């Protein structure tokens, strides 16, 4: 099947396929700074041999679990030999949203609200949404603001929140079986031609904060432990 490059990303390239779907090519490039891997950085900082492969493997694993639970995603199939994943077409909300689900109070949450809660305290699958905007530091945005700005309807937000909490629990339960604890995780969503919300992008170690025996596991170590 012929493919046409339509977008070159930091960690993935996107190709249009003849059948109307898209092909994501996972790369070994990682976001980071000064040669140090950091999923929170906004530019490619280094190349790690095999990282594209492990990110694709984890994405396949969890997308199949999420699809089996009846939750809509863009995942169609994947080819590990050429590190690609075929996905359904989807439009992003606005210029892109990131949705975080938190089971523990850490990271930017504790920096914002540390005077009200202890670091590491339990949270009830707390969901927050940010605009993808590097220049503004990915600002938080509320449900009311998203509706008022015409980015998404209240119904789409409610669907996205419900999906986020269910997907997060699926991943947390799986990690728990492996002796690990999910603290928080980041997702991206889009919608199809009928306005149905769907999970897009990837489900990889660089998008989640995971601990084992009280110690943080960096994304590359997490990937190795996950498939050990």
Annotate the PLM regions.
Residues 1-130:
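Active-site loop/lid in soluble adenylation, ligation, and acyl-transfer enzymes
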Residues 21, 94-96, 179-182, 194-197:
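Coil-to-beta-strand transition motifs
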Residues 39-54, 139-163:
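Short histidine-centered catalytic/ligand-binding loop motif
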Residues 74-83, 175-191:
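A short glycine-rich, hydrophobically flanked beta-strand micro-motif that places a catalytic Asp/Glu
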Residues 101, 182-202:
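Conserved metal-phosphate-binding beta-hairpin within the catalytic cores
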Residues 111, 119, 202-228:
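C-terminal helix-cap and adjacent tail motif
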Residues 128-138:
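Active-site cradle of extracellular carbohydrate-active enzymes
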Residues 152-183:
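A long amphipathic alpha-helix within ATP-dependent nucleotide-binding catalytic cores
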């Amino acid at each position: 099947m012929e493919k046409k490059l339509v977008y070159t990303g930091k960690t993935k390239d996107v190709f249009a396929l003849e059948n109307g779907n898209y092909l994501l090519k996972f790369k070994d490039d990682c976001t980071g700074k000064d040669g140090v891997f950091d999923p929170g950085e906004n530019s490619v900082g280094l190349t790690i041999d095999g990282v594209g492969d492990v990110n694709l493997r984890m994405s396949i694993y969890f997308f199949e679990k999420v699809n089996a639970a009846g939750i809509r995603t863009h995942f169609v199939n994947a080819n590990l030999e050429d590190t690609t994943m075929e996905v359904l077409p989807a439009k992003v909300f606005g210029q892109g949203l990131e949705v975080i689900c938190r089971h523990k109070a850490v990271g930017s949450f504790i920096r914002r609200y540390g005077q009200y809660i202890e670091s590491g305290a339990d949270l009830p699958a707390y969901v927050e949404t940010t605009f993808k905007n590097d220049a503004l530091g990915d600002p938080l945005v509320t449900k009311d603001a998203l509706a008022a700005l015409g980015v998404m309807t209240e119904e789409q937000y409610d669907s996205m929140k419900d999906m986020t909490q269910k997907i997060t629990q699926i991943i947390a339960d799986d990690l728990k079986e492996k002796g690990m604890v999910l603290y928080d995780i980041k997702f991206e969503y889009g919608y199809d031609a009928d306005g149905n919300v769907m999970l897009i992008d990837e489900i990889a170690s660089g998008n989640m904060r995971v601990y084992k025996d009280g110690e943080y596991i960096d994304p590359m170590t997490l990937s190795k432990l996950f498939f050990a």
